[in-house]
A protein has these predicted regions:
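Class I S-adenosyl-L-methionine
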Residues: 1-103, 110-111, 207-209, 217-218
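A contiguous loop/helix-start segment that scaffolds small-molecule binding in enzyme catalytic cores
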Residues: 2-6, 74, 145-235
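Class I SAM-dependent methyltransferase SAM-binding "motif I" and its flanking Rossmann-like core
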Residues: 13, 80, 84-149, 199-202, ...
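Secondary-structure boundary/capping motif
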Residues: 16-17, 85, 133-134, 162-163, ...
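Structural motif
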Residues: 33-36, 54-56, 79-81, 129, ...
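Positions that flank functional sites
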Residues: 40, 108, 128, 159, ...
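A short, acidic, amphipathic alpha-helical segment used as a generic capping/interface helix at domain edges
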Residues: 64-68, 134-143, 173-175, 207-208
Length: 235
């Protein structure tokens, strides 16, 4: 079987695609990806065999390509970083194709943290963007906030099932229901990061109640306290 790559192509702007990922895509014969992801790399798709997938048909397409791959090279691009929020898909790709080479990309989490000026080394990163239960992740969010960490969080859009839908408004009510004073909690929400449609919101968690945001959004709970190296200088 030929080579198979899972690559991260950044949050949405072609400017955030790394050189190594560009090389892999240009080298590949077959590209399999979601519509939004393919749009990010559209200039690199000339003369490629391209398959646009959805959640409904992805298994069928992966199986089809696996059977006919031969000595060809296949790249499967993911929005952001392939190592974040995509483990369920990557695990399945490994089951289907065997060896899959993983090339990281720039995550919207990194961009959101930078824009909010919240350092990752003082933060907890949590993704609710999974199909499995998120109850433990909800507890993880509570603990991180109680422990004084900033939190960069990817919410879970699931509009067809309100019991699984856990976006900004649901998160705000959840935290309030669990004893947090959300009127005093600073939060950023970024949508469509790095693209022409990028928007940002800054306010309190309480402000998020009944407010709607895009599926392509990231939250940053800001509890950062500046600590420069000068504060730790010793004689």
């Amino acid at each position: 079987m030929g080579e198979v790559y899972a690559v991260g192509v950044g949050p949405g702007s072609a400017r955030y695609i790394t050189d190594v990922v560009k090389e892999v895509i240009l080298y590949s014969d077959i590209i399999i990806g979601y519509k939004y992801t393919l749009k990010t790399i559209e200039r690199l798709l000339v003369n490629k065999e391209v398959y646009e997938i959805t959640m409904q048909n992805q298994e069928e397409i992966y199986q089809k390509v696996a059977k006919t791959l031969g000595d060809k090279t296949c790249a499967i691009p993911f929005t952001g970083d392939v190592n974040f929020s995509e483990s369920e898909v990557v695990d399945r790709l490994i089951e289907i194709f065997g060896k899959v080479q993983i090339i990281p990309g720039i995550s919207s989490v990194q961009v959101a943290a930078a824009k909010a000026r919240v350092p990752l080394d003082k933060s907890k990163v949590i993704t609710m963007h999974v199909t499995t239960s998120i109850e433990e992740k909800k507890l993880e969010l509570q603990k991180a906030l109680l422990d004084g960490y900033s939190v960069i969080l990817v919410p879970r859009p699931w509009p067809k099932d309100p019991t699984k839908h856990f976006m900004q408004s649901e998160i705000a009510f959840y935290l309030k229901d669990h004893g947090f004073d959300t009127s005093k909690m600073k939060v950023h929400v970024f949508e469509f990061l790095t693209t022409d449609k990028e928007t940002s919101f800054v306010g309190t968690v309480k402000d998020l109640e009944c407010r709607q945001f895009s599926d392509l959004s990231v939250m940053v709970f800001d509890q950062t306290k500046p600590e420069s190296y000068i504060n730790f200088k010793t004689n």
